[in-house]
């Protein structure tokens, strides 16, 4: 089994592992690397099957997490965006000795809308999966557009995400389909009460995929951490609002209140 693409940079002493979302790759973090490099040693990872960690093998959430753990520092902060947030949360739940702190960005322990739980309708995710077979490229572009919908800088943010996708090899349809299945089927809510490490949860106030209404519900399920809602942001707050995002992240890492 080949190693994942893993790029380490930054002059800081704290290790920070950054995990991207569905359809993308580690290049999505490049715009905030300069703001974080002084405080952190950054580990930019292409998840299995994505970008330069190519391959057609679909992975379960546990398998994907194990692949990242195999190359991760012995102890680090883990930051995951969207699908990457599920991987980071899985690591924190089942390997807490390896995770000094958890940061999730526009992520949810359960992405699918359920009774009294806001999220993405299951039929919408099914629809994207069926579209992957018919129009691979267009389906990815549609999903990227959904991630920025509502933000003041939506058009600019969509262009930025699209450039990230095009900068590296596209994931296979099998890998993308498996990723959508993870978003549709994963439910980590029952395990959240066992988390006993610092946890910062970023949400975009205008996010249509992970609605801000989920924030107090996650707060009620977890004994630790807190939620931070960024006004004017959609599903990619680190792209649309890099300054408040990086400031809050650095304060969290320093152990200060955010």
Curated annotation (Swiss-Prot):
Role, per record: The physiological role of BioH is to remove the methyl group introduced by BioC when the pimeloyl moiety is complete. It allows to synthesize pimeloyl-ACP via the fatty acid synthetic pathway through the hydrolysis of the ester bonds of pimeloyl-ACP esters.
Class of enzymatic activity (EC top level): hydrolase
Pathway note: Cofactor biosynthesis; biotin biosynthesis
Family: Belongs to the AB hydrolase superfamily. Carboxylesterase BioH family.
Entry annotation: catalytic residues: 82, 207, 235
Gene of this entry: bioH
Annotated keywords: Biotin biosynthesis, Cytoplasm, Hydrolase, Serine esterase
Protein name (Swiss-Prot/TrEMBL): Pimeloyl-[acyl-carrier protein] methyl ester esterase
Organism: Edwardsiella ictaluri (strain 93-146)
Localization annotation: Cytoplasm
Gene3D superfamilies on file: alpha/beta hydrolase (3.40.50.1820)
């Amino acid at each position: 089994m080949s190693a994942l693409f893993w790029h380490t940079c930054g002059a800081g002493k704290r290790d920070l592992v950054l995990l991207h979302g569905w359809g993308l790759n580690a290049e999505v973090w490049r715009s905030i690397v300069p703001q974080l490099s002084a405080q952190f040693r950054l580990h930019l990872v292409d998840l299995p099957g994505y970008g330069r960690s190519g391959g057609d093998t679909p992975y379960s959430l546990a398998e994907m997490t194990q692949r990242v753990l195999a190359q991760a520092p012995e102890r680090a902060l883990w930051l995951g965006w969207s699908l990457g947030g599920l991987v980071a949360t899985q690591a924190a739940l089942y390997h807490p000795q390896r995770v000094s702190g958890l940061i999730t960005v526009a992520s949810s322990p359960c992405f699918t809308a359920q009774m009294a739980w806001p999220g993405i309708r299951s039929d919408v995710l099914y629809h994207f999966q069926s579209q992957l077979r018919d129009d691979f490229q267009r389906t990815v572009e549609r999903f990227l557009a959904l991630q920025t919908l509502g933000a003041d800088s939506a058009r600019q943010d969509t262009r930025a995400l699209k450039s990230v996708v095009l900068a590296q090899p596209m994931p296979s349809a099998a890998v993308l389909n498996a990723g959508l299945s993870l978003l549709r089927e994963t439910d980590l809510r029952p395990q959240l009460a066992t988390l006993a490490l610092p946890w910062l949860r970023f949400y975009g106030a205008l996010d249509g995929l992970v609605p801000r209404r989920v924030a107090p519900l996650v707060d009620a399920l977890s004994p630790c951490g807190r939620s931070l809602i960024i006004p004017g942001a959609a599903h990619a707050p680190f792209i649309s609002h890099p300054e408040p995002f990086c400031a809050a992240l650095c304060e969290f890492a320093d152990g200060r209140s955010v």
